[in-house]
Amino acid sequence: DHGQIDIRQVFHLNACLVDMGFIRLGANGLPEEYEAYSFSAGFSTHIHLKDKGDERLVSRVHKALLALQAAYPQCIDRVYTAEEALKEEGLSGEFSFVVEGALGTLFQNSFTAPILISRESPLYDQYSATHGHHPSKGEKPPFVAFGPDIRPGVVIDGADLLDECPTLAALAGVDMPQMEGKPFPILK
């Protein structure tokens, strides 16, 4: 599996989008209308647009996200377009942008919380660590295997997480031809 990183601070990107006019809240503090919203994936967050075909909206939101990155460099490492996320990271989905947090910055979905809450703040109410970060960050947990179907003494310096499931399926004798990835070169 993948590791976890300690949370240093929580960033509420939806609160920024409210302040920028991309989300309008009702009297109950919940969205009544939106043009863009953030949906947290932990240390990264996906930005969804009401109308992905509206080029003007796409441009406005992209500029706003880059402005937030410039204003909060301690919180935001990278803003990916959907095309960049697919090309560079193999990440696809219904989102228009992906925002990658700086090391230790957790994204949450609140619309009304303070934009930034440090771990030392009395307002901090999150767990201590989580995942959802870029693969270049954090510890790299080992994959350890042994048994009658495993070649002894094999060490792989690095591997793709997508290759874990095909490895386990091969060990179980399950044929899954449509699966992404390939078994680790550890099988007899």
Give residue ranges: language-model regions.
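Secreted, luminal/periplasmic, and some membrane-associated catalytic domains
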Residues: 2-119, 123-125
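Short, electropositive, low-hydrophobicity segments enriched in small/polar residues
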Residues: 7, 25, 136, 177, ...
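Substrate-binding rim/cap in mid-to-C-terminal beta-strand-loop elements of soluble/periplasmic
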Residues: 22-55, 126-171
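Short clusters of hydrophobic/aromatic residues that line enzyme substrate/ligand-binding pockets
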Residues: 79, 150, 184
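Composition- and surface-driven signal marking solvent-exposed, interaction-prone regions
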Residues: 112-114, 157-158, 180-182
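Short, well-structured beta-strand/strand-turn elements
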Residues: 174-180
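Cytosolic regulatory/linker segments at or just downstream of nucleotide-handling modules
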Residues: 182-188
